[in-house]
Structure formats: C-alpha cells, structure tokens
Amino acid sequence: MFNIVLVHPQIPQNTGSIGRMCVNADCSLHIVKPTMFEISDKTVKRAGLDYWHLLDVHVYENLEEFLTIHHDKVERFFFATTKTKKPYFEASFQAGDFLFFGGESTGLPMDLMQLKWDNAITIPMGKNGRSLNQATSAGVILYDAIRQNFSAFEMV
C-alpha cells in the first residue's frame, strides 16, 4: 500500500521494528545505504521478530541508485523532517506514496528534500521536544496515511 524509505539508518532495532510494522501494514521497506549495521544483523531480525521473512524489502547501495530507479515517482515522495512547520496531517497521502525517514542522528539530506520540498512534513512536538524515535515517527505518519486511505486497506 505504501513505501517506507529509510535513508542511512543507524539503529538496527529501529529498522527491525519498522520492518515488522511494514509487514503488518502491507507496506514495502526501502533501505538506502550506507547503514551503521548489516541488514542481516541479528538485532534487526530480533526486533522484526518472525516477520522478517515476510517483509517486502529493497536495499539500495546509495541514494543515487534509489533515485535512478524511482525518479518517476518524485511527486509522491514525502519527507519526515524537523526542518519544516507543515504538520503531517495536512498532507494528502495516496496508496503507493513513498514516506522517507532519515538517519536517527542526521535526518534526511536537504538536497533530497528539495526534490519536492512541498512534501516535507513534520510531527508537531511540545516546546521541550526535539524529535521522536525513528520507528515511532514512521508509525505515526504511516498510520495516518492508512487512515486517509482506509477503504483500500485490506485487514485480516
């Protein structure tokens, strides 16, 4: 239904949790290297529990490879970032959209987000907050996208 894109993820447990969520939400997971861990790392699979073998996962050597393959879908790229004021719930998501999340300590590259800056979105936080955990952020935004497209969501 949707595509989660992790650009340079750093924490294997987050990637594993997001992978598990993708299986449960009928989404594809795209991982853009470099990563700070091996995709086959046991901590990734442990966090993904027994779902990992069910995951539709695509791994790219770098951002250039990802963009070469998906260049025709830029209009449907959405970028989770703290660098915008536009809340995620003002976005209009469609099945097939790509939801991007950056590395836990680095975020997304600005040049990537500038491909479609109008689709940069944020999760509102209180004055003392800086950012949410990557897996939490992915869940918040993904499930709002599903809510907006619930009639197309196939539940078990």
Give the location of each predicted region.
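Post-transcriptional modification and biogenesis factors for structured RNAs
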Residues: 1-156
